[in-house]
Amino acid sequence: LKLRYYQRDAIDSLHHWFANRPAEDHALIVLPTAAGKTIIFSHFIKEILAKDPTARFLVMAHRKELVEQAETKLKTVWPDAPVGVLAAGMKRFEIDSQILIASRDTLASPKRLDAVGSFDYMIIDEAHNVPPSSHTRYKKIITTLSDRNPMKVMGCTATPYRMGQGYIYGNRKDHFFKGLAYSVSIPELIRNGFLCRLSAYAVNEDAIIDAGAVALKFKNGDFKESELEKIAMVDDTILQVINDWIDNAY
């Protein structure tokens, strides 16, 4: 699998970051959706293990789909990769794997955190989900494992900010990531033919939800999905959205 120029640049930037920064300086790479973030960290893992066959990796994601995607992409890059999965939703508990792709919620239990041992590198997919609060599952996992062994940590995201916090990297106390190891923009990837140009269409105004008319509850700086579903998942709205999509997409 031939890497695109920016994917190679991102990997080289990560190597440089970890070679020149202390372990507590966590790195962030920012690439648009569909730029191949999973391909990047899969190649990065393979290159590190080629130099240090004893290194151990934890890839952490918060959704089952992201766990499955990470395993698939890693095996595409490296079919014989020593990879396993820890995810209750997939009924897989391969905790001794050299490359462990783990569901955040499955790993967060004290029993499993104790059982997985230590890691040299941690990769966090969809890193904007790491909240500033220290009393979260993410922080519990990271703190516990870092106390066990000072891991080198990197995050991947297309959106390096959170509501109520702003950017998730920098030198403030609530910044988990110390800086950008690498980033590339949507316009650059469009210009170079790696992403399609965008065409945006507004849906029929009959389908627009008046969220201001309902007292929606927040959770971790965002609307609660269950609250949104109450006003969004209704037949008239869904039908109008589907009709608009068909009219504009075909």
Annotate each language-model stretch with its function.
Residues G89-Y121:
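Conserved helix/coil segment N-terminal to the catalytic DExD/H
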Residues R21-F44:
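Walker A/P-loop
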Residues A35-I40, P53-T76:
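Conserved Walker A/P-loop ATP-binding site and its immediately adjacent core
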Residues D125-E126:
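Walker B catalytic acidic pair
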Residues G179-Y250:
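Conserved interdomain linker/interface between the two RecA-like ATPase lobes of SF2 helicase motors
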Residues N129-A200:
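Post-DEXD/H (motif II) to motif III coupling segment of the RecA-like Helicase ATP-binding lobe
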Residues R56, E71, W78-K91:
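Conserved RecA-like helicase motor-core motifs
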Residues K2-A23:
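N-terminal pre-P-loop "Q-motif" helix
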